[in-house]
Amino acid sequence: MQWLADYWWIILILLVGMILNGIKELRRLDHKRFLDNKPELPPHRDNNAQWDDEDDWPDQNKKK
């Protein structure tokens, strides 16, 4: 870990460079064009659809 104490500034420069490149690429992104051309999402499929019709509660009008 001695090398980390000696060369911490190089690691810091690399991290700052990666952050700046990320910001630069995000600025190039045209979000308006993406929103105009985005694909339609398929309808949401409920995984519990087969159980939705079943009545979980007992009938209150049943005579005991």
Swiss-Prot record:
Gene Ontology cellular-component annotations: plasma membrane
Basic and acidic residues biased stretches: 36-47
Disulfide bridges in this chain: none
Segments for region (Disordered): 36-64
UniProt cross-references to HAMAP family, sorted A to Z: UPF0370
Family: Belongs to the UPF0370 family.
Protein name: UPF0370 protein YPO3055/y1425/YP_2677
Upper lineage: Bacteria, Pseudomonadati, Pseudomonadota, Gammaproteobacteria, Enterobacterales
